[in-house]
């Protein structure tokens, strides 16, 4: 066993704490270790690595491996961030004839969405899961049809609906049936994509909240596994998100590169890092502008969007496109950075640095901004820890975790890296993290352009070996995007798991909404910088008057800005 492989002391700790439980182990890369354990010990093993060894649950997913070993499998991927930093994936095999395994959620709350999704997509039952509602599948989906099973269905066909009624039950954990309900949706508060929010209120005060997403689930994983070649999935991953598409394509390509042991040239690695920071600029500036809008500071909104346009020009100069770059390929980058383009980019970065500083000085000195954001939408550090939140959201709650620093990928090992965190846990803290990251992104772009290594852009001539697997990851503006790929034997992926950053943050939104007012809801939701398919209406349920009212989003937005003439009255 090579000593350069990280995670050996975690493996030793597992064997000491649970003798005979680890059935197999293997390293995919020097810092990625997968351990297969006895299924009955799964909750204890994940809890041990999570709370006692400093792990964070990054993603969990199922896999139909009946053609490979006769079983289903469930994978729990943990980012180990205390002491030696590496990745440990806990794998269990699930009997194909009795598709059940013990739920981890009662011990590690971060597992709740992943286990619900595994149940929806594979029919694997997490016994003891506290929330047994569907997560991804609609109410009218047939009970015994599981989309990601290899023998289940043709992804191009949608089965006939089984019911016309909505059967999903929204849960009010802290209130009772006396609470009023405010439904928001099924479209989102900033009109991106659809989701349904339901606020349980007493007058103006939010007692609890619940929400349902996945109204436009696109079936990308099934599409990739059945219809696309390896590099075609690269362009599909570029379109997972309208803002952080390059982060997704970077995470996907690195997952395959890690599985195949492909060493990408340093020049391509650095170009990837530079473009990821350009993407961070226009995403954070968009969010800062929207925060101004939600607090009634529309001149700030317009000015931040004006400066954001400079970052879009920067992207166009470097890539030829303002948004979806299409530059990543497995093994490297399709297009080089030209000398004149780099000179223009440096000039734009200097201009942006001055303009952002002027805007931030105005923003942070605006009394209404402080009144509307300080102490609002608090996310306690303990809740963030329990649910493995990511990105500016977790960093604003006192946890200085950032994949760029914890697990340096692409060119970040060559760049000066500073992780910004805040202790306030509220909306203003999340804004401050993003502000600091804008400055850091500009510095990293300058440094990367000044120190761009020479050499080729691509590695070619490699072959794909079936059934190799590994993780790929990227720190997108909203947090880390995690991809896991297993190669197949027909020049297609056997399994692709794509987890966007917001997926890791949604489960804690209800805790952030509790104790605030209805007029704060758009600002709190916006502080996640959510990426989900969006809502135009909200349902408000008054717990005292025992009635619900549908509030159009424009009314909710107006109320958030003006703070008068409540739409609930």
Swiss-Prot record:
Residues 538-569 form a propeptide. Pfam families: Complex1_30kDa, Complex1_49kDa, NiFeSe_Hases. One of its GO terms (molecular function) is NAD binding. InterPro entries: ComplexI_49kDa-like, NADH_Q_OxRdtase_suD, NADH_quin_OxRdtase_su_C/D-like, NADH_UbQ_OxRdtase_30kDa_su, NADH_UbQ_OxRdtase_49kDa_CS, Ni-dep_hyd_lsu, NiFe-Hase_large. The keyword Transcription regulation does not apply. GO terms for cellular component: formate dehydrogenase complex. Its cofactor is [4Fe-4S] cluster; Ni(2+). GO terms for biological process: anaerobic electron transport chain; anaerobic respiration; formate oxidation; glucose catabolic process. PROSITE patterns: COMPLEX1_49K (PS00535). Binds 1 [4Fe-4S] cluster. Keywords: 4Fe-4S, Iron, Iron-sulfur, Metal-binding, NAD, Nickel, Oxidoreductase. The keyword Plastid does not apply. FHL comprises of a formate dehydrogenase, unidentified electron carriers and a hydrogenase (isoenzyme 3). In this non-energy conserving pathway molecular hydrogen and carbodioxide from formate are released. Belongs to the complex I 49 kDa subunit family. This is Formate hydrogenlyase subunit 5.
């Amino acid at each position: 066993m090579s000593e350069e492989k990280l995670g050996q002391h975690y493996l030793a700790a597992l064997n000491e704490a649970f003798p005979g439980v680890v059935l197999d182990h293997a390293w995919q890369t020097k810092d990625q270790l997968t351990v297969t354990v006895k299924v009955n010990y799964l909750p204890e093993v994940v809890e041990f690595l999570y709370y006692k060894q400093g792990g964070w649950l990054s993603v969990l997913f199922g896999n139909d491996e009946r053609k490979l070993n006769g079983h289903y499998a469930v994978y729990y991927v943990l980012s180990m961030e205390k002491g030696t930093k590496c990745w440990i994936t806990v794998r269990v095999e699930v009997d194909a004839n009795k598709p059940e395994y013990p739920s981890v959620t009662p011990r590690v709350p971060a597992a709740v969405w992943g286990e619900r999704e595994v149940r929806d997509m594979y029919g694997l039952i997490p016994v003891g899961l506290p929330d047994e509602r569907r997560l991804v599948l609609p109410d009218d989906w047939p009970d015994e049809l599981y989309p990601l099973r290899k023998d289940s269905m043709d992804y191009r066909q949608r089965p006939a609906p089984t019911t016309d009624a909505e059967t999903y039950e929204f849960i009010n954990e802290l209130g009772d049936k006396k609470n009023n309900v405010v439904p928001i949706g099924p479209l989102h508060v900033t009109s991106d994509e659809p989701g349904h929010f339901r606020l349980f209120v007493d007058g103006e005060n939010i007692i609890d909240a619940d929400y349902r997403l996945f109204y436009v689930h696109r079936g990308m994983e099934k599409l990739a596994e059945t219809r696309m070649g390896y590099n075609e999935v690269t362009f599909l991953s570029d379109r997972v998100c309208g803002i952080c598409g390059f982060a997704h394509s970077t995470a996907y390509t690195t997952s395959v590169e890690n599985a195949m042991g492909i060493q990408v040239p340093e020049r391509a690695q650095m170009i990837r890092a530079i473009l990821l920071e350009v993407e961070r600029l226009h995403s954070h500036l968009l969010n800062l502008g929207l925060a101004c809008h939600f607090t009634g500071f529309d001149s700030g909104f317009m000015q931040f969007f004006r400066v954001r346009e400079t970052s879009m020009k920067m992207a166009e100069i470097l890539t030829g496109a303002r948004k979806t770059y299409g530059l990543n390929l497995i093994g490297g980058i399709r297009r080089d950075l030209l000398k004149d383009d780099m000179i223009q980019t440096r000039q734009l970065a200097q201009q942006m640095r001055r303009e952002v500083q002027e805007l931030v000085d105005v923003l942070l000195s605006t009394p209404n901004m402080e009144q509307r954001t300080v102490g609002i939408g608090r996310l306690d550090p303990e809740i963030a820890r329990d649910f493995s939140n990511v990105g500016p959201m977790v960093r604003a709650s006192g946890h200085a975790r950032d994949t760029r620093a914890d697990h340096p990928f692409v060119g970040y090992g060559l760049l000066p890296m500073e992780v910004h965190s805040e202790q306030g846990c509220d909306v203003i803290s999340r804004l401050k993290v993003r502000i600091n990251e804008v400055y850091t992104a500009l510095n990293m772009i300058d440094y990367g352009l000044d120190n761009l290594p020479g050499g080729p852009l691509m590695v070619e001539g490699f072959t794909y070996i079936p059934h190799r697997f590994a993780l790929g990851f990227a720190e997108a503006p909203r947090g880390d995007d995690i991809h896991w790929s297993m190669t197949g034997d027909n020049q297609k992926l056997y399994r692709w798991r794509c987890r966007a950053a917001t997926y890791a943050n949604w489960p804690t939104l209800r805790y952030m909404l509790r104790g605030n007012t209805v007029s704060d809801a758009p600002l709190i939701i916006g502080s996640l910088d959510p990426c989900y398919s969006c809502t135009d209406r909200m349902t408000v349920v008054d717990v005292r008057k025992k009635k619900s009212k549908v509030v159009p989003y424009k009314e909710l937005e107006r109320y958030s800005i003006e703070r008068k003439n409540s739409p609930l009255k």
